[in-house]
Amino acid sequence: MEVKKNQDYIVTIEDLSVEGEGIGKISEGELGKENGFPLFIKDTVIGDVAKVRVIKVKKNYGYGRLMEIITPSPNRVKPLCPVARQCGGCTLQCMTYEEQLKFKRRKVENNLRRIGGLKDIEVPMTLGMEKPWRYRNKAQVPFGFDKGGICAGFYAGRTHSIIDSEDCLIAPEINQTIIREIKSFMEEYHVAPYDEERGTGIVRHALIRVGFHTGQILVCLVINADSLPHADKLTERLIKIQGMTSVCLNINKKKTNVILGEKVVNLFGPGYLEDKIGEVTFQISPQSFFQVNPSQTEVLYKKALEFAGLTGQETVWDLYCGIGTISLFLARSAKKVYGVEIIPAAIEDARGNAARNGLDNTEFFVGKAEEVLPEWYEKRDSKEERHADVIVVDPPRKGCDSVLLDTITAMHPDRIVYVSCDSATLARDLKYLTEKVCNEGKEGEYRYQVEKVQPVDMFPWSAHVETVVLLSKLQQK
């Protein structure tokens, strides 16, 4: 029996994909196949017995749409968000939070074993949140038209169709007030939202940042024009909101999916807000990269600091340092910290943040980490000058390239702390680092081994997980 599109089947969910989709097999009785035909089905949990409709068929697998839960899994819950199945963000809301933490632990462990070749690795339970709601300090809200007029909310999963929704349960409640004020302003003054297909209209997105420790708020309206009609009237409305610190415009007239343009026009306040992670204060502008979950960021950075094992005498490199978030955490406990980041504005923020916190033992470089570090290394004459005690890397999803990893090991640090947002590329890089035999001259050969691993849940209700890994130098006999 051939599996065809639009057919319905009863399946039991036996596993989860790395994206959190349930995996169920159409039974061998129906197909006459030894192992059954696997389907990937969103919004299902291991243990669910579900009626699913086939929506896409590949050679060896397919995709199904959940039609009905026949027997729910013990780990299944009703999503709190009324639009959870439409939204592309919180894909795991049908799963208990405890089960999500287990899923993320398994995901990291499986990747480290399968891709990284770390067969005996034991990964501890994911560090989660006591209250995993209202945790995001940043929202990018798209505007558009629907049958009811101006709409604002979020994109439906894997589309650019806007679902009108003022509230998001992982964002601060104050965002609702801000969105209502912007929509009301647009309706009163006939300011049209952006039409993505035609490239017409003005208001594209509202970027909202909230300082969880300071209570400060920044609102940046992204517009498809050089100016916003009646901008003063919008500013008057927004500054009445308690905590409003900065109001600005971002100019983006390109027909692109990229949200922010390069130019920012300030309407009110300093054009940034301040917030804290631990004891470190940061200045955050509209275009700054800053972790969106400040509570778990502190957990993540404290774990990275613990793995770094600093005593105050170490020279540390922080690669992909952003606005200096990890760098400044490290600088409080290190002799010297060097940071590298490709975005010039981020390095300006990093230098400003260091000065703001009185940390004069930092130095920041603009450029690609895979270019800056090798160039710096080649210009140093002695092994002592080239040496780093600890190197911290926090790369984008693609991980590190081999040139950078080779330079890192050539600097023979005692410890490497790898912070990753993608456990698959993490595993690939760990395999490279642990299999590479390095030479330290007359002191002999050495290699790196994985000492500790810790997953951290930065994005509850999604399939994403951050991981911190400690590698230590092991002298060869």
Q: Can you say where each PLM-predicted feature lies in the sequence?
A:
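Rossmann-like S-adenosyl-L-methionine
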Residues: 2-6, 18, 22, 230-241, ...
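Short beta-strand elements
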Residues: 14, 134-145, 149-157, 208-210, ...
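Short, acidic/hydrophobic/Gly-rich beta-strand patch recurrent on exposed beta strands
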Residues: 22-28, 153-156, 220-222, 350
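Short, conserved phosphate/pyrophosphate- and ester-handling motifs at nucleotide-, phospho-/glycolipid
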Residues: 47, 171, 293
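Extended interfacial segments that mediate partner engagement and assembly in macromolecular machines
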Residues: 67-79, 85-193, 228
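Short, aliphatic-rich beta-strand segments
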Residues: 208, 215-224, 281-285, 390
